[in-house]
Amino acid sequence: MQVDSAFSIDYDFVKELKTRTGGKKMSETGLTTLSYVNTVIRERPREIHKGQCGRVLIVAGSVGMAGACVLSTGAALRCGAGLVKAAVPEEIFPILQIAVPQATCTNVSDREFLRSVSVHDAIGIGPGMGVSEKKYKLIEEILSLFDGPVVIDADGITNLCRFGKKTEILKGRENVVLTPHPGECDRLLD
């Protein structure tokens, strides 16, 4: 089945891949190898400053779902981003700042952070952010202000499916990556 909208996925290929790999991890299939990863992720030179390694904004987390934000913020740092800012509810600042002290926090409820989205090199949206029309409107606003690379995951995808016209707001953008789990993928393709 071919789906044409803001993205294109050959769902039959995904099913075929699962069948052929027998559910093995990608690293066990030879599709992703350590030698390939080493060509993509390189050791950072010692003399480089963190400000030269990219700025990432993570819009994630909510009361009761701080862990999702901790994991995604930490992942951005481990993947090499020099400066990572998390836009989260103020109530979870202490959790994030203890778990990922290298990251900075901004209050997602104070729309002030939207003025500076363009200074980032990439944005991650969704993990644990919660699902509501207000969250969908926030995603819409971020996408209207930022034309760089965006990764939308978890609750971000659910918000697109529930309150938007799925991927309609992504049309014309080539730099958006959706990372659905099987249930989210079903909602996107439904």
Regions found by a protein language model. Give the residues of each.
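Substrate-binding N-lobe of the ribokinase-like
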Residues: 48-107
